[in-house]
């Protein structure tokens, strides 16, 4: 089971890093596309939240 969790964490980590880069890129382009700040930030927030929840799940499984 932990192998499948580790695979999910890897996917979620990649998704979170992409969301982080999207937010970073948006910040560098400001004030262009300022209207997208909340949308892009929400995606990053959700991606990192999902990653942290899955890491906690793995930690409980291993303990």
Tell what function each PLM region has.
Residues 1-3, 60-63:
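Short intrinsically disordered terminal tails
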Residues 1-30:
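N-terminal acidic leader/helix
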Residues 25-62:
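Short, charge-rich amphipathic interface segments used for partner binding and complex assembly
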């Amino acid at each position: 089971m932990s192998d499948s969790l580790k695979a999910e964490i890897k996917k979620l980590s990649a998704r979170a890093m992409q969301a982080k880069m999207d937010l970073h890129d948006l910040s560098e382009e400001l004030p262009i596309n300022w209207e997208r700040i909340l949308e892009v930030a929400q995606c990053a927030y959700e991606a990192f939240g999902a990653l942290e929840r899955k890491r906690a799940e793995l930690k409980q499984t291993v303990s």
